[in-house]
Amino acid sequence: MKRVKRVLALLAAFALVLAMAVPAFADGAEATYTLTINNANGTYEAYQIFSGDLSEKEAGKKVLSNIQWGSGVDATKMGSESAATVAESLTTSALAENFAEDLVSNSKLSSVKATATAKNGTAVFTGLSAGYYLVKNSSIDSGKTYTDFILEVVGNTTANHKGDVPDVEKKVEEKNDSTGATATWGATADYDVGDEINFELMGTLPESYGRYTTYKYKFDDTMTNMTYRNGSVKVYYVKDGSTNRVEISSGFASAWVDGNKKLTVTFDDLKTAVPGLAHGDKIVVTYTATLDANAVVGGNGNPNKVKLEYSNNPNDEGTGETPEKTVVVFTYKTIINKVTKGTDGNNVPLAGAEFTLSKFIASESGSDTVTVNGTEYHGTWNRGVTVTPTNTGNIANVFTFSGLDAGIYRLTETKTPEGYNTIDPVYFEIVATNDGTKVTNMEGKAVNGSEISFTENATNGSLSADVINNAGTTLPSTGGMGTTVFYVVGGGLMAVAVVLLVTKKRMENKR
């Protein structure tokens, strides 16, 4: 009997009892108690597994003796062992959990003693007599897991819902190819249209993972305005506390659907696919996608989401889903207005130009240099892009370069309007910030000694600037000073010749 008492004390510890009090009651009346579940969700059922005689051997310490099967157990299914013998065998938390699962999965429970539904995260049972109870969910809220556990009730008792859910994260790689800065991983990034972008999904196994004999684990990932790069999916596991990734080559299925916009990676049974995993271990999925030409510019960007489907009932085949996690990829645009000075001194549209916008790509072996904020970077300018201008009124002078990453750029006038001087190349940097969901600030900075002023618009992710062409110096035309001088000099020579001719004739006549 002493061993039974020790076991029951151990079960009390398993139950995470946080508070206990015995209310006053009239002589001869059976005492009843409340059981409060914190972090609760859904509806719970309480089954009395063990009953007995409640006594207080020491001040403040209450125990059950004369252990019997409670009203919540079908004693005919419990074999020949007595309740006291079974209770005495439950010497560890693992054995207690296995016992609870055996009762549930093998239909050994009978009458429900009480039910309670969670409200604002708390479920309260009332009118419970002394004993040991198995508490389990009969229903759960969306995104939660079922639980079942055994705990002692010998007074008003408080416990925590012990079911937990796996966690999932999604990250996108951010890199500045104009400066060559070390790439980082986070919730946002900005890229050029056509760039390849690396993504990472990471799911962490829950505390309850060890209670399952099979475990479904499915990543459900949805991209926006991107196209998957064929063959780029890789799957790994990482042990808790380690950074070493071990590639998983079998036991799962990956598929792209909805025009390569949605990725699923499914483990029908993670326990079989990767034996030996435990609470805190991680499953990691990586893949690469390309930013499409129809990507949203500025604003709310291009969100990409992931959720995790997982087994949520160790005694059944049900599944739950985590809330979605989102990362956002941004891209921007630069608008160049070709203008000249009008007679009133104001800028007026000017047609006939052509521009090429090139991006600086950092490289230690690059032969080009650019200076930004006093720092010189080595690299090369890419081939750049040329766009067809749109009109201001009926004048084609607006050049929109869309789908740009943050970085360093060079604007070159590759065709100059007739009668105007070609501008020097203009160097500038695109700088943008966001709050995780939308662009909050845009800035265009002149670099490398250039002069240019931008108007920023974070809502549409644009930087706009006027580029001015000045008329060239006109060469002298017929009737100009050069010709006049020529005429004057020529006329003078003719006059001299006439004078000489007349003088010569007079001299001849005198002879």
Task: State what each model feature region is.
Residues 2-511:
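Solvent-exposed loop/turn and edge beta-strand elements of beta-rich ligand-binding domains
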